[in-house]
């Protein structure tokens, strides 16, 4: 979703994002693939697409200034960087969501984006960890077995594999190949 992002961008805005796979914050929560994965953990924490893409932006020095989506993803964004402006447009409750009116959502998003872009957006830059340890939990043990053949991947249980690197691009490459 951020494959065209490069250093020429001033900022990254994320609209319509959702909580990480296995989260109860949204019945549609997933990370990259709900049909293949239970969850992804990055350095021991559940990883969302927001986090994966934010780290990709960080490799290029592009700040993540705005996130909208469910309440869970907005809380995660502010945990990663309290300066990221967020707008929660829905809240997951069991197998459903409670959403604000679409016109109100558009209005809040527009106001928040205009506001954050007038501020010092450098405060929204995300610091990358020095090392990355990714755990993938597959729904099917055969997918984990297949993924275990990726160079550097270690199978740690029938459904889970782990990959480590100091280079975030290698993490992205691995995700592209095994998910």
Regions found by a protein language model. Give the residues of each.
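Short beta-strand segments
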Residues: 12-16, 67-68, 137
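Active-site glycine-rich loop that binds ribose-phosphate moieties when present
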Residues: 34-60, 66-73
């Amino acid at each position: 979703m951020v494959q065209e992002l490069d250093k020429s961008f001033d900022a990254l805005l994320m609209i319509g994002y959702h909580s990480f796979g296995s989260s109860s914050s949204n019945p549609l929560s997933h990370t990259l693939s709900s049909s293949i994965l239970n969850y992804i953990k990055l350095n021991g924490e559940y990883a969302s697409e927001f986090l994966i893409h934010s780290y990709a932006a960080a490799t290029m020095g592009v700040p993540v200034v705005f996130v909208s989506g469910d309440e869970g993803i907005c809380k995660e964004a502010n945990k990663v960087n309290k300066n990221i402006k967020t707008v929660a447009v829905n809240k997951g409750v069991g197998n459903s969501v409670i959403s604000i009116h679409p016109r109100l959502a558009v209005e809040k998003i527009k106001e928040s984006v205009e506001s954050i872009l007038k501020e010092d957006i450098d405060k929204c830059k995300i610091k990358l960890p020095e090392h990355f340890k990714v755990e993938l939990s597959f729904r099917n043990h055969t997918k984990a077995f297949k993924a275990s053949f990726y160079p550097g991947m270690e199978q740690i249980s029938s459904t889970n594999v782990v990959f480590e690197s100091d280079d975030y691009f290698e993490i992205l490459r691995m995700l592209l190949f095994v998910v």
